[in-house]
Amino acid sequence: MSKQFVRSAKNMMKGYSSTQVLVRDATANDSRTPSIDTLDDLAQRSYDSVDFFEIMDMLDKRLNDKGKYWRHVAKSLTVLDYLVRFGSENCVLWCRENFYVIKTLREFRHENESGFDEGQIIRVKAKELVSLLNDEERLREERSMNTRNRRANRAARPRPRRQRTRSNPHDSSPSYQDDLEKALEESRITAQEDEQRRRELAQYDDEDPDFQAALQLSKEEEELKQLQELQRLQKQQQSLSQFQAPLQQQQPQQQPAYYDIFGNPISQDEYLQYQYQQDQEQAMAQQRWLDQQQEQQQLAEQQYFQQQQQAAAAASALQQQQTAANMQQQQQQPADFQQPLPTGSNNPFSMDNLERQKQEQQHAQLQRQQEEARQQQEQLKLQQLQRQQQEEAQLHQKRQEEAQLQQQQAQLLQQQAQFQQQQPLKQTRTGNQSISDKYSDLNTLLATGTGIDTFGNTGEARIPAQHTKTGTFINSQGTGYKQVTNEPKNNPFLSNQYTGLPSTNIVPTQTGYGFGNQPQSPPTNSPQQNPTGISYSQPQQQQQPQQQPQYMQNFQQQQPQYAQNFQQQPQYTQNYQQQPQYIQPHQQQQQQQQQQQQQQGYTPDQGVSLIDL
């Protein structure tokens, strides 16, 4: 009575409306359960927008209350479940918007001072409401059926008025009598509604979802009352046991209450049987796990042993293939090891047959992989052998070609040497024939060593003698190297004196465009070249000694004319200066040619060109 007074005072002080007061009374923190009339009244008021917001605001506060006010949470879930089933559609929408709040309550826990968990009933209600909200088809069917039932109830009775008048109960005025009659009439109508509802529920089949939901709610309320009664009795026994005698303390204490996973109280035997079943299932699961681990380990060992055998077989096959690669014959593959025949049950659904099938499949797969690996290795080896054979053939062919080239080169060199030995060196003309013919007399004069130079010198004082003395001087062109021979001279005038160039057999040199580098022939005297009719060729052996003074006299008379003609030819000096110099390889080649000519007995021309000047 005191709690109701305090609650009424709070309602007046905080200015709660009639709807909010009704929600607070339905979710009060006491052992009473909300009545069906109160829940139906809240469901009717949920169709009004103002009352709907007031109801949901108060329920939201109750659902988020502290753990010690667990009754607020449990009764709020009961009211909310009834509104979802019998209230307006806005109640369903609000629950879906605040779905996380209801889902969180599935883990609600609160233990009292004695260690008892008070959150069991809250968890059960929250799970039931969450499953109902998730199943839209079931929710739609329940709401449609409840709507038809509510309309039938409204047609059966008129709705009473909610006019409330404040009057003194001890007043004997007519208004008090009217209120009393109205209250009696309302109680009678409520009793009739309850009776009619019980009759309707009795007519429902046990499989009706609405009937099952209502029955579940009534069971939960009854269980909640029983739990509360048990807790009260436990507290009383604990308080009495503290003041009992030692003999009474030795008596066995009351056994604790046991509950199943749904929060329903069960006996100790049922609880022990449930625990035994759980332990047995856990032991069976653990045994199955151990069996699976052993099977996996055995399978791994078998696979490892098979891999070792396959590796050994592959090594032996590789050796055989290497030895038979040259013969190019296909070798037989090593036979597989004989597997033990399985024995046991013929049941196709037994675990042994399934494991055996798995092992056979794995073994067949491993054999296919090994066969593919062997084929790939054989192909690679054949390719390598083909490459080696091709490389060896290419090397052999290259060696044969090189040997043939060397043999051909040796034959060519031998033929060239034989050809050079068979054919003597031919005289080549390197000068200008017209110039040589024009100045043949001067060339002959200089070659014989008689006469004087342009400066009037005679004998060894002649300028050409300093540059054309063979055997003692070598010019830049190589003239004079090993040109002195021991053959007898035909000139009788060179036996006692040395006037210019000695009469030696000189090898003709190919020195460019200088005159005098052509085969020397006795000059033909013409009236134009020699008006005196005297020949200036080399004196022959048949000439008489008494003719020498006349020859010298005639030569001295004609000397100025020859010197003048020689001075008028600057072109020959330029040609001589422009001649390229031979390098050492050319000199060596010339020396070899001279030696070959001397061995063959070839006598070169004794003429000397003007370029030697």
From Swiss-Prot:
Keywords: Cytoplasm, Endocytosis, Isopeptide bond, Lipid-binding, Membrane, Phosphoprotein, Repeat, Ubl conjugation. Residues 148-167 have a biased composition (Basic residues). This is Epsin-2. Present with 1970 molecules/cell in log phase SD medium. The gene is ENT2. Residues 11-143 form the ENTH domain. Residues 340-350, 471-512 have a biased composition (Polar residues). It comes from Saccharomyces cerevisiae (strain ATCC 204508 / S288c). Phosphorylated by PRK1. Residues 179-188 have a biased composition (Basic and acidic residues). It is found in: Cytoplasm; Membrane. Belongs to the epsin family. Residues 175-194, 206-225 form the UIM domain. The keyword Calcium does not apply. It is a peripheral membrane protein. Binds to membranes enriched in phosphatidylinositol 3,5-bisphosphate (PtdIns(3,5)P2) and phosphatidylinositol 4,5-bisphosphate (PtdIns(4,5)P2). Required for endocytosis and localization of actin.
